[in-house]
Amino acid sequence: MDRNSVIGLVLISLIMIVWMQFMAPEKKPLQDIDKPAVSLQEEVSPVSDIPAAAATPESYGEFSAMSDGEEKLLTVDNEYFTAVLSSRGATLKSMMLKKHLDSSREQFNLIRKNDSGALSLFFLTQAGKQIDTRDLYFSTAVTESQVTVGADNQFSVTYRLDVAPEKNIVITYTFSGDSYAIGYDISMNGFASEIAGNEFQLQWDGGLVHSEKNDDDELHNSWAAAYMGGSLLKLDASDQSKTYREEQSGVAGWVAARTKYFVAAMIPSSETEGVYLAGKRLAGEPFENYTTALKFRVPSDESSFKESLRLYVGPIDYNVLNALGVNLEKIMDFGWDWLTRPFAEYIILPIFDLLNKFIGNYGLIIIIFAFLIKLVTYPLTMASTKSMKKMSALQPMMKEIQEKYKDNPAKLQSELGRIYKEAGVNPLGGCLPVVLQMPLLFAMFYVFRSSIQLRQHGFLWANDLSVPDSILDFGFSIPLYGDHIALFPILMAVAVFLQQKITPTAQTNDQMKAMIYIFPVMMLLFFNNMPAGLGLYYLMFNVFSIAQTWYINKTASTDDLPALSPVVAAPPKAPKKKKNARKR
């Protein structure tokens, strides 16, 4: 490997480290926004700020009669989840997924606010009363406490809040037996002139429960978001010293709160008035508390208002989210939209899905994928290796030129350019395959880090390809390395070292010899904290590279080098005349 190749590899690796650690992708600016965004506020008025302990019947005005009652729970089972609904607030109190477990491989409740529930309607009355429907008791005609919905069936349950004659709120949930999506219909009758500002909010409160062992990783991948005007509005409440808030007017495609692998989204079917996002990380807590809300306008000249939505509380699975048809897959972080996202969406995931139809083990799929990439890039690798072999053969002549024209840089560059042209080589040819593969490697990083397909799928000693394949935990962290030893990165570093040893090189100086040892160590440090799937991919990629390079070295030759013009000796410099010399 010549000097330019190594420098390119080192620079690209450094860029990759800086990029992934500090340079999060910027989102496009929102379009068609009527109000300026308000963010990073030190004080935020929560969507509902009446403490439960302080609430009294008088706090609810004409709703006071509904503030006392008996809570009835309804459990709904389908193929994918077990949900628990409550008549107090007509809210969702529990959501346990059947096909996705927590880090202990046990079922868990995704709903953080499992005491009060996650969903509610919020509005102010003309009398100034702040209403959160989770404080009110609804009635329902369903008498069962548990319902199982078959694969081809649906089940609906309606909750009704009768405030006065011809004044009521009706909420209906519709479950399908074979879908994560839940129908959510709202009907408000007789409230045309009763709601302050003729506006109410449908809110999801509390975000979601963390499912992974690494809380820092969960925090890094948890945020609230809204999709408006074809752009993603994102709110990340990672700073404990601040309370975050975003409020935008306009039509929203959805609002959502996510963790690393799961998302809770509200998807309206008609135009909204805007969105509300808020978040705060409490000191000492390993999670962030998020609130997302959709704003709706109640027409003042109509006696009733109806809105149909879909709720999605489930895995961040690209195919499932994409099938909803509302761009909810944009919640997935695949890096830059113009570079890495196309690789992830149109190359990596489709190939993985295709291979998964025939192969059930994702470790084998990753190995086959690495082989396919090497196969596709073989022409580039062949041209690169031949170019480096020619550069190696030209090395004696290049050293001679450098020696003869060391005092004449312009002439030196001219002669080197002539040699490259006559020999038909490109001094940067060794970097080309690496540069072309870097966007794919970046995209692989994002896919392996965020794709739920790899989660809790093992291969060999790795129990989970979405996290590092630790074989020894230290109990403390070593700077730049981490708190564990992962085996795939060690094997990958060895493969990188061997691959460099057999790769033709045009440089033999001490710095280049040192890079043969330094570069594998750099890769080891970087990949030790990466997902095991990524380490496996790059390990096998380098194993295939070793086999490919060995084959090319056996079959390629430099016999096709053309006859080069001889090096012309540099003319001797004329002696300088001394000033004020005496004439003879």
Swiss-Prot record:
GO molecular function, one term: membrane insertase activity
Transmembrane feature ranges: 5-25, 358-378, 428-448, 478-498, 516-536
Localization per record: Cell inner membrane
Basic residues: bias regions: 574-584
Region (Disordered): 563-584
Domain of life (superkingdom): Bacteria
PANTHER family, A to Z: CYTOCHROME C OXIDASE ASSEMBLY PROTEIN COX18, MITOCHONDRIAL, OXA1
Gene name of the encoded protein: yidC
GO biological process, one term: protein insertion into membrane
Identification of the protein by name: Membrane protein insertase YidC
Quaternary structure annotation from Swiss-Prot or TrEMBL: Interacts with the Sec translocase complex via SecD. Specifically interacts with transmembrane segments of nascent integral membrane proteins during membrane integration.
UniProt entry keywords in alphabetical sequence: Cell inner membrane, Cell membrane, Chaperone, Membrane, Protein transport, Transmembrane, Transmembrane helix, Transport
Membrane topology category: Multi-pass membrane protein
Keyword Glycoprotein listed: no
Main location class: membrane
Any one annotated GO CC term: plasma membrane
Function recorded in the entry: Required for the insertion and/or proper folding and/or complex formation of integral membrane proteins into the membrane. Involved in integration of membrane proteins that insert both dependently and independently of the Sec translocase complex, as well as at least some lipoproteins. Aids folding of multispanning membrane proteins.
One Pfam family hit: YidC_periplas
Family: Belongs to the OXA1/ALB3/YidC family. Type 1 subfamily.
